[in-house]
Amino acid sequence: MRVLGIDPGSRITGYGLVEQHGSRLVHLDNGAVFTDKAKDFPDRLRLIFEGLSRVIAEYAPDAVAVEDVYVSENVRAALKLGQARGAAIAAAVHAGLPVFEYTASQVKQAVVGQGRAGKEQVQKMVKALLGLPEIAQADASDAVAVAICHINSYQLRLQAGPAVATSRRASSWRNYRP
């Protein structure tokens, strides 16, 4: 299974591709889509959509996992983050891919084993799990963690059987039709 993980942001949207080979996780690529804050916001959303569409076309993932919006006291920032997530989800749905969403604490739990783990702990574990010396961009590292979270969660759902699969906490946009 090949998964594209996405850490959405209105300025920087990180992405990471991880593939599962048996019990091994293999890092394929990671990076970020950068937008220019001087541009108008709809144009920045277009850049996110187009950038992720290129990544999807190049790597042909089987699924996309997106970090869910966290609660923010800054309503304007939360709305912009939600719109950036929408652009990312639209790119995946446009390509016909299933989309799964995970909260930050679900990602941390799946990667580190603790839902309140710090960013540094997550980055360290991502590097250890994939045998990487470094991941240059923090947003890309977070996106790789989201991909790992989906692979681990997917495997657990398969092992647990249909009862868990129907009551999963991660939501899917697979059946969404505008």
Curated annotation (Swiss-Prot):
Subcellular compartments: Cytoplasm
EC number: 3.1.21.10
InterPro entries: RNaseH-like_sf, RNaseH_sf, X-over_junc_endoDNase_Mg_BS, X-over_junc_endoDNase_RuvC
Enzyme class: hydrolase
Cofactor: Mg(2+)
Alphabetized PROSITE patterns for the sequence: RUVC
Organism lineage: Bacteria, Pseudomonadati, Thermodesulfobacteriota, Desulfuromonadia, Geobacterales
Catalytic activity field: Endonucleolytic cleavage at a junction such as a reciprocal single-stranded crossover between two homologous DNA duplexes (Holliday junction)
GO cellular component: cytoplasm; Holliday junction resolvase complex
Gene, per the UniProt record: ruvC
Entries under Pfam families matching the protein: RuvC
Residue numbers annotated as active site: D7, E67, D139
Keyword DNA repair: yes
Co-factor binding comment: Binds 2 Mg(2+) ion per subunit.
Assembly, per entry: Homodimer which binds Holliday junction (HJ) DNA. The HJ becomes 2-fold symmetrical on binding to RuvC with unstacked arms; it has a different conformation from HJ DNA in complex with RuvA. In the full resolvosome a probable DNA-RuvA(4)-RuvB(12)-RuvC(2) complex forms which resolves the HJ.
Family: Belongs to the RuvC family.
Keyword terms: Cytoplasm, DNA damage, DNA recombination, DNA repair, DNA-binding, Endonuclease, Hydrolase, Magnesium, Metal-binding, Nuclease
Binding-site residues for Mg(2+) 2, renumbered to this chain: E67
This protein's name: Crossover junction endodeoxyribonuclease RuvC
Organism: Trichlorobacter lovleyi (strain ATCC BAA-1151 / DSM 17278 / SZ)
GO biological process, one term: DNA recombination
Residues annotated for Mg(2+) 1 binding in this entry: D7, D139
One Gene Ontology MF term: magnesium ion binding
UniProt function note: The RuvA-RuvB-RuvC complex processes Holliday junction (HJ) DNA during genetic recombination and DNA repair. Endonuclease that resolves HJ intermediates. Cleaves cruciform DNA by making single-stranded nicks across the HJ at symmetrical positions within the homologous arms, yielding a 5'-phosphate and a 3'-hydroxyl group; requires a central core of homology in the junction. The consensus cleavage sequence is 5'-(A/T)TT(C/G)-3'. Cleavage occurs on the 3'-side of the TT dinucleotide at the point of strand exchange.
